[in-house]
Amino acid sequence: MAQRLLLRRFLASVISRKPSQGQWPPLTSRALQTPQCSPGGLTVTPNPARTIYTTRISLTTFNIQDGPDFQDRVVNSETPVVVDFHAQWCGPCKILGPRLEKMVAKQHGKVVMAKVDIDDHTDLAIEYEVSAVPTVLAMKNGDVVDKFVGIKDEDQLEAFLKKLIG
């Protein structure tokens, strides 16, 4: 319920206003912007404490939603992509995921990371021959250029990323 309300507020603010330099408009609903009268005759006025400001950030990691999303954001990407095939129940995935995200973020946009849950996207796991998790693919111009299975330390991950970037 709270997520739906927050999404509704966000969409209302994005549609009604253009973002200012470096910031999104405040997340408020139209109900909070204009006074409302209730059946009891009470007037509700906007509460400034409910205004939320956000800043624009560059996302280097994203979750794949479906096959066409994978095609669009990974295969057709001009930026090299690290694809992390993982599962919620996988212990090593929970260690590698944050470590890999941190290393990708250090590359400042030279590479991005796509996360694919194999339980939700078994078709992609089969297509890319994922037989164990975590499996990480390095993709450039739609082609798999490197791959590893299992956990790697930060030095090995850095070498993997440098090889992908070129």
UniProtKB/Swiss-Prot annotation:
N6-acetyllysine: residues carrying this PTM: K152
GO terms, biological process: cell redox homeostasis
Keywords, alphabetical: Acetylation, Disulfide bond, Electron transport, Mitochondrion, Neurodegeneration, Primary mitochondrial disease, Redox-active center, Transit peptide, Transport
Name of the protein described by the UniProt record: Thioredoxin, mitochondrial
Cellular-component GO terms for this entry: mitochondrial matrix; mitochondrion; nucleolus
Thioredoxin domain: residues covered: 61-166
Tissue expression pattern: Widely expressed in adult (at protein level) and fetal tissues.
Ranges that cross the membrane: none
Disorder noted: Combined oxidative phosphorylation deficiency 29: An autosomal recessive, infantile-onset, neurodegenerative disorder characterized by decreased activities of mitochondrial respiratory complexes I and III, severe cerebellar atrophy, epilepsy, dystonia, optic atrophy, and peripheral neuropathy.
GO molecular function: protein-disulfide reductase activity
Family: Belongs to the thioredoxin family.
Transit peptide (residue range): 1-59
Phylogenetic lineage: Eukaryota, Metazoa, Chordata, Craniata, Vertebrata
Main location: mitochondrion
Organism: Homo sapiens
Compartment annotation: Mitochondrion
NCBIfam families in the record: thioredoxin
Assembly with partners or alone: Monomer.
Domain of life of the organism encoding this protein: Eukaryota
Site residues, Deprotonates C-terminal active site Cys: D84
Protein function: Important for the control of mitochondrial reactive oxygen species homeostasis, apoptosis regulation and cell viability Is involved in various redox reactions including the reduction of protein disulfide bonds, through the reversible oxidation of its active center dithiol to a disulfide.
Disulfide links within the chain: C90-C93
Chain positions found as N6-succinyllysine: K152
Record CDD domains: TRX_family
Entry keyword Phosphoprotein: no
